[in-house]
């Protein structure tokens, strides 16, 4: 039988995270969970009590900052721990506020029928994202301006980008790599997971002090390799990852009104479920989904 590794990055909404863990509690699943070190207090025992059949491995918490290299490092850590733990047929990266809109049975059937593919999303809308790679983005971890100290360093980091533009700095000027971008979540095979880890030093060198490149580093490596020929749907980043995302809602959240659409969808995962009615929505979804 197939075996999955679910790699979960969480930082809030532990009520939703518990529902996610309960949903993934299947003997065929190994669940690798990283919780941001900056997260509010939570009860680890309560999380462990959600699991009876699967294996739950909670990684040592590190601070993860939005848009910062720490996001990439966290993904690599999850891949490292999960590939060393066991051989899995697929590694699924999920956020803590993401949820399967199909049952584990359905999801396993889908991947058994499609095990030749890599579920990585590509989007070629524009080359604007190259700005994220051209300059040094220092002090990204202070960009949320939580206090005076962060405001000071965050402000300096912010001012350094136009200065670099003025000075003509371009980190990728002589780089022959074709950079690609796409949806940040994916489902990948064991060989691709190992391939990414073999390139860890190169990833660090290239993407440290860049901005929001968790949507770039895997796509770029896959595009330059034979794995690109196995991508499920290179023309649609969400279909290729079997994910649903909402842009209609100002906070990109799903609500009760979206239930019929979620049930009708052929996708496997959706995000985000972190609105006021998220628990009610997930409960109804679980009752009625395939």
Which residues make up each language-model segment?
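ER/Golgi luminal nucleotide-sugar-dependent glycosyltransferases, focusing on the catalytic module
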Residues: 2-290
């Amino acid at each position: 039988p197939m075996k999955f590794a679910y790699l979960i990055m969480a930082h809030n909404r532990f009520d939703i995270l518990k529902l996610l863990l309960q949903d993934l509690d299947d003997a065929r699943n190994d669940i690798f969970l990283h919780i941001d070190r900056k997260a509010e207090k939570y009860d680890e025992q309560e999380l462990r009590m959600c699991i009876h059949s699967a294996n739950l491995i909670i990684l040592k918490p590190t601070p993860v900052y939005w848009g910062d290299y720490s996001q990439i490092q966290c993904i690599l850590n999850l891949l490292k721990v999960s590939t060393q733990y066991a051989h899995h047929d697929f590694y699924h990266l999920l956020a803590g506020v993401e949820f399967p809109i199909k049952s584990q049975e359905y999801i396993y059937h889908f991947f058994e029928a499609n095990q030749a593919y890599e579920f990585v999303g590509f989007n070629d809308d524009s080359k604007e994202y190259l700005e994220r790679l051209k300059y040094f983005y220092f002090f990204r971890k202070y960009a949320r301006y939580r206090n005076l100290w962060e405001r000071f360093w965050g402000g300096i980091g912010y001012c350094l980008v136009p200065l670099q533009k003025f000075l003509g700095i371009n980190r990728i000027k002589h780089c022959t790599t074709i950079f690609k971008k796409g949806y940040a979540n994916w489902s990948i095979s064991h060989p691709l997971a190992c391939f990414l880890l073999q390139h860890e030093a190169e990833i660090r060198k290239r993407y440290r002090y860049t901005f929001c490149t968790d949507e770039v580093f895997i796509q770029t490596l896959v595009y330059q390799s034979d794995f690109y020929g196995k991508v499920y749907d290179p023309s649609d980043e969400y279909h290729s990852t079997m994910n649903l995302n909402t842009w209609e809602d100002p906070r990109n959240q799903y609500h009760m009104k979206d239930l019929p659409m979620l049930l009708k969808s052929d996708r496997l995962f959706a995000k985000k479920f972190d609105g006021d009615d998220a628990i009610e929505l997930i409960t109804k979804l679980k009752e009625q989904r395939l």
